Amino acid sequence: MVHPLIPQLESLARPLAARLGYELVQMVFHTNQYPPVLRVDIRPLDPEQETSHADCEAMSQALEVELDRVDLIPGHYVLEVSSPGISNLLISDRDFVVFKGFAVEVTVDPPYKGKAVWSGHLLGRDEEKVALSLKGRRVQLPRASVQRVVLSGAETE
């Protein structure tokens, strides 16, 4: 479940990241640890560049100033800024563009047409649906029902 502060924190961090030349990939607030950990994953807007330690440091310093200014998080916490690394999980719009045509596994809840897991080749994603090719047949899954999309690495066509 997404922590209730995440939408506010993302709305603060996303434009800051963009000004610095980064994409905010994901933000998670781990409150089951003491002190809690706010983890922020970034990557350069330029797809040819890798995320460096200096990138993470620059974003961390800038975000720390903003977080202190708005004082959204009560008490002590740890801010961690890092690269998302290589992940099979597709999250951002950029992921869905980069991995178009790749084999994916999509988990939906509630099940769509009686199935909770769909495997096929990614055709794309928009505001309303995630589109897959299943043996040449286009299937459009309601985006609101999509729980996760992962690269499967398996041939499905």
From Swiss-Prot:
UniProt keyword terms in alphabetical order: Cytoplasm, Ribosome biogenesis
InterPro entries: Ribosome_maturation_RimP, RimP_C_sf, RimP_N, RimP_N_sf
Leader sequence segment: none
Principal subcellular localisation of the protein: cytoplasm
Pfam family, one: RimP_N
Gene Ontology BP, a term: ribosomal small subunit assembly
GO cellular component: cytosol
Disulfide bonds: none
Magnesium found in the keyword field: no
Top-level lineage group: Bacteria
Subcellular location(s) per record: Cytoplasm
Function, as annotated: Required for maturation of 30S ribosomal subunits.
Similarity comment text for this entry: Belongs to the RimP family.
Protein name per the record: Ribosome maturation factor RimP
High-level lineage: Bacteria, Bacillati, Cyanobacteriota, Cyanophyceae, Synechococcales
